[in-house]
Amino acid sequence: MLRTTFLRTPRQLMRKSPRASFSIVTRAAFPHLKNNQDEAEKKEQGLFDSNKKRLDTLEHGKNPDYKQPGMEDLKKKGDDARIEQNRPDDGVY
């Protein structure tokens, strides 16, 4: 009885599990959206999808024109953000 409970390989798990119809591959094919979203959720989901697409292109895309900003540019950008958000510089980074 314990032998059938503790399966050793994913193939055995797929065959013997009652959840085999909902394997990882099958669940990945399901859409990640809710069926009935209100306007706020649709707006937030659209923002999430656009940010995810942008992140994927930044991480995996090949852009030969991209030049990493220098330390001075990054420091200036951080100082401008701190001033814009009206936060004191706490010195913790």
Curated annotation (Swiss-Prot):
GO cellular component, one term: mitochondrion
Main location (coarse class): mitochondrion
Skewed-composition ranges (Basic and acidic residues): 35-93
Induction: Induced under aerobic conditions and by mild heat stress.
Region Disordered, annotated ranges: 30-93
Keywords linked to the UniProt accession: Mitochondrion, Transit peptide
FT transit peptide: 1-25
Keyword Transcription regulation (UniProt): no
Disulfide bonds: none
Presence of keyword Ribosomal protein: no
Cellular compartments annotated: Mitochondrion
Miscellaneous: Present with 937 molecules/cell in log phase SD medium.
Name of this chain's protein: Protein FMP16, mitochondrial
Lineage, opening ranks: Eukaryota, Fungi, Dikarya, Ascomycota, Saccharomycotina
